[in-house]
Amino acid sequence: MEDWTKVCQTVERVDDLPSEPRTRAGFLKYSQEITLDPNTAQRKLRLSEGNRKVTRMREDQLHPDHPDRFTDMFQVLSRESLTGRCYWEVEWRGRGVCVSVAYKSISRAGGRDAFGFNDKSWMLECFPNSYTFYHNNIESPVSGPQSSRIGVYVDHTAGILSFYSVSETMTLLHRVNTTFTEPLHAGINIYLIGNSAEFCKLR
């Protein structure tokens, strides 16, 4: 009887979790303002627009030494740590921009720091004609309408991470069901010089 009570309590807790929104208006109720942390930006990344936009540059930027800075990959993390239910959108430009979430404890160098190629990050790779999802060095092809705007929804408690193509409508590109063990941070990786990504103002 005691074990059955535990099962019932678990089911009740799962049932209590709110479902994922079904409309953009529903997602916007959980909109999260995202700013990028200059202390994590790789030296060839320039931040602008109040640290909401990141652009890959040819020359090193004047970033001071910091233990949180990515030294190899052209990556940056958000200043905000994300728990609970959050939604944000990224407008990207170019030919190779990665929209990611990661734990702050991700490595900053040494080949295991690339978003999507370790167990501490999840990445949607965006090209003009294709998407690919990566986690823990496993590649998953993604099909869906191409858009320069990607919506990201996180329900940290429920272990849900979803990526959406956003235009006049929202189309689910990829959903992850997992258990998050740390707060998450939004992340961007930019492959090519001149490419950029900007976190959109939704409020």
Question: Where are the model-predicted features located?
Answer:
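Beta-rich ligand-recognition domains in immune and ubiquitin systems
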Residues: 1-203
